[in-house]
Amino acid sequence: MGLFFDVLSAINNPNQQGSVTQLESITNSIQQLATSRGIQPSQMQTVMSVLGNVLRPALQKQQSTLGGNQLQNLIGQAIGTSASASGLQSLMSPQLQQQIVQTVSQRTGLSPNAIQAALPTLTSAVMGLLNMGTTKPGVSGSNSILSTFLDSDRDGDTDLGDVLRFANRFLNPSAI
């Protein structure tokens, strides 16, 4: 739940870019994708967990190569291209994309073609979530959400599937 608490903190912090509207947009895009592809909510939660576990080391490597600010800029640019293949390729090599497709497919039972088709939308949603911790222009500071995600000690506090589940509960308390 640690990462979700950072999301809530970013929403409540006037110096960070996170908002309830952003969180709703991210969860809605994931829900629409799941509905259009016939993916059950529990299966989508698993998809997000696996995606986060595969993306984390790739982003950690980029952070060590490029530096934290450059990684943040790259994430911002990828979001700006919306769920497009070019935005995806700016963050991940085709080899990494293929690894993600295979890993998610193996762990969820979804077809590789379904994962490949969903990957730009899913990655855009993850990057949007990670970008919510960015400080507003003119304010110094680091992205707390991205830092928490990358500095994970693998205790489960940064599971993107859990973040999706808690976000849905937060946004739709009557649906619990």
Short names for language-model regions:
Residues 1-176:
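A structural "flexibility-hinge" signal
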